[in-house]
Amino acid sequence: MLTTLLPLLPLLLPGWALCSQEASDGPWDLHMTQVSYFRNPSQVWHRGNATLGGVLTHVLEGPGRNVSIQQLQPLQEPDSWALTKIYLNRYLEEFVGLVQVVHQERGVTFPLIIRCFLGCELPPEGSEARVFFEVAVNGSSFVNFQPKTASWVAEPHAPSRVVTYTVDQLNKYNRTRYELREFLQDTCVQYIQKHITTNNLKGSQTGRSYTSLVLGVLVGCFIVTGVAVGIFLCTGGRRRC
C-alpha cells in the first residue's frame, strides 16, 4: 500500500518554501516539496504544496488524520479529485505508521522533521536544465542526488556511519538511481516544455493531464522516499543502522 501511494506525495509542499506564487519571466520550473513534523510518534503535522511555473497548484496542511487538502487549479474533475484526496489521506496514514514502526525498531529521538525538495528548472533556450532532489533531516542537509552520475552523495558536513549507510543503500538500486534520473532529466523537463511553454496550465491541456503525469511518473521518485525514509529516521536516534 505504501508503494502505491507514494506517488501522491509530490502534491505536497510547505507554503514557506515557495519563492513565488505567480508566473514569472524567469526559468520555467516544476517544484515539489514535502515536510512532516513529528512531535512524538503519535503526533504529526503535515505541510505541503506544489508549484508549476511559479503558480501554486496544490496545498496541504493539518495534523494526523485531519489534513486539509486543496486543489487550487482546475486540473482534475471533482470526482477524480475526491478520489485523489482519499489516496493522499491514506498515504499519510501509512507514512505515520512507517515512522512509528521505525521508532519501535530503532528508538528514534523526537521531535523529528523530514523534508524532501525536488524538481526541475528549464532555463533559456540553449542552456542545460537544472534538476535536483535534496533531503534534509531536522533542518540539516542530509543527502542529495547527482544526476550526471545517477548517484546519491552525502552532504560534506554530515559524515557519519548512518549517512554512509544511507548513501550505500540508495546507490544499490536502479530504481533509486537511473529511474530517478530519467524522471528528473526527461519526464519533468518534457512536461514543462509541453505544458507551461504552451500556456496550458490554466487552459485545456493536450496529451496526458497534469494529474496523470504527477501520479504516474513520480512513482520512481517517491519510491526513493519509501526505500530511504526509514534510514533517514535513524539519524534522529542513538542507534546505528
UniProtKB/Swiss-Prot annotation:
UniProt keywords, alphabetically: Blood coagulation, Disulfide bond, Glycoprotein, Hemostasis, Membrane, Receptor, Signal, Transmembrane, Transmembrane helix
Record-annotated disulphide pairs: 120-188, 221-234
Main location: membrane
Cytoplasmic side: 234-241
GO terms for MF: signaling receptor activity
Signal peptide: 1-17
Superkingdom, taxonomy of origin: Eukaryota
Gene Ontology BP annotations: blood coagulation; negative regulation of coagulation
Subcellular location: Membrane
Its membrane topology: Single-pass type I membrane protein
Membrane-spanning residues: 213-233
InterPro entries in UniProt: Endothetial_C_recpt, MHC_I-like_Ag-recog, MHC_I-like_Ag-recog_sf, MHC_I/II-like_Ag-recog
Positions bearing carbohydrate: 49, 66, 138, 174
One Pfam short name: MHC_I_3
Gene3D superfamilies assigned: MHC class I-like antigen recognition-like
Function: Binds activated protein C. Enhances protein C activation by the thrombin-thrombomodulin complex; plays a role in the protein C pathway controlling blood coagulation.
UniProt-recorded name of the protein: Endothelial protein C receptor
High-level lineage: Eukaryota, Metazoa, Chordata, Craniata, Vertebrata
